[in-house]
Amino acid sequence: YDVTLAVKAGADVVVVDGMQGGTAATQDVFIEHVGIPTLPAVRMAVEALQEMDMHRKVQLVVSGGIRSGADVAKALALGADAVAIGTAALIALGDQSPEFDEDYKAIGSAAGFWDDYQQGNDPAGITTQDPELAKRLDPILGGRRLANYINVLTLELQTLARACGKSHVHNLEPEDMVALTMEAAAMAGVPLAGTSWIPGKNGV
């Protein structure tokens, strides 16, 4: 209903954020128990747009756990127009680096496990307003790392599109996907691998 309301309110872009995102800027109960996984969120948003004949007219952007070219390919195949990345970009910039492990330990965590980005005490100097911490971020090196990450993600996406016989990543479609488990098939609305069966479709 949220997508329908957004479109009726005049939105020209809808952003769907699945529960697999890396945020810690909320209560634990929200992180663990609120929201739905990203792929079914995409499917439901696309269905809502299609019902209003607004799919591809209103842009659909997907975020929440997008880390690899395969994640992007799945989102585009299900009908998204674009994706947004958050935590993966922070890590590409240099967050969670073992270089700052002692600093992470000093604030009660460890490199690779810290997720309190909202507190402003990021040892890597990325998500902070503290001038001393901010000096730790080398914007040139960080920019190169982020560019490398996005280039690799794009190459993975293009490779998967080619493997599906597509000339462009935006030509990916649900028919290019199968699921490996019944749960994934039901959530994403694609057939279970080796069958034409989509659990829950047509009441079966």
Show the residue positions of the predicted features:
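C-terminal extensions of enzymes
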Residues: 133-204
